[in-house]
């Protein structure tokens, strides 16, 4: 069974993915995959080198420099994003195939823009994760995401209401870690996945 996580930025999707690990889930962490691709994928590195001056350091993509180009969100960035999404999708398909061989009960996709990139089509269920505005603001502050970047990210995402409507379950991460874990356990139990 494959579960995808969705929600706004700074709501705790990666934390929820880690909670699922406690119940034996394998997690596909797209951010980790992208970090690896920025180090080794020759097509992605070459494209960045040609289109984003200064974004390559020691043969790898420098995420800090690259993030400045994100704010332009021009055709070069959209093409770059398409290359990255395609490479991540290839890695996801390998991950799913390998996991089928060992017959694991649960895979969790921690993929930013899960719905927008259509990665949700791999999922049996989708969980909408949310937090109250105070908790979300605190997390965004900890990640040094300023208003300009937040506004751009929000503009390329589906509206939160639509994400919620497309989801099968919801988890509120505004509460204690224990309560969040109990919400994850309730979902695992409802899907008869507990061991």
From Swiss-Prot:
Keyword Cytoplasm: yes
Protein name per its UniProtKB record: Dephospho-CoA kinase
Broad class of the protein's primary localization: cytoplasm
Phylogenetic placement of the source organism: Bacteria, Pseudomonadati, Pseudomonadota, Alphaproteobacteria, Rickettsiales
Similarity comment: family membership: Belongs to the CoaE family.
SUPFAM superfamilies in UniProt: P-loop containing nucleoside triphosphate hydrolases
UniProt domain DPCK: residue ranges: 2-195
Function description: Catalyzes the phosphorylation of the 3'-hydroxyl group of dephosphocoenzyme A to form coenzyme A.
Alphabetized InterPro entries for the sequence: Depp_CoAkinase, P-loop_NTPase
UniProt entry keywords in alphabetical sequence: ATP-binding, Coenzyme A biosynthesis, Cytoplasm, Kinase, Nucleotide-binding, Transferase
GO CC terms of this entry: cytoplasm
Signal peptide: none
Pfam families: CoaE (PF01121)
EC number: 2.7.1.24
HAMAP family, sorted: Dephospho_CoA_kinase
Gene3D superfamilies, per database record: P-loop containing nucleotide triphosphate hydrolases
GO MF, one annotated term: dephospho-CoA kinase activity
UniProt keyword Iron present: no
Pathway given in the UniProt record: Cofactor biosynthesis; coenzyme A biosynthesis; CoA from (R)-pantothenate: step 5/5
Enzymatic class: transferase
Subcellular locations according to the entry: Cytoplasm
PROSITE patterns reported in the protein's UniProt record: DPCK
Catalyzed reaction equations: 3'-dephospho-CoA + ATP = ADP + CoA + H(+)
One GO process term, biological-process aspect: coenzyme A biosynthetic process
Gene: coaE
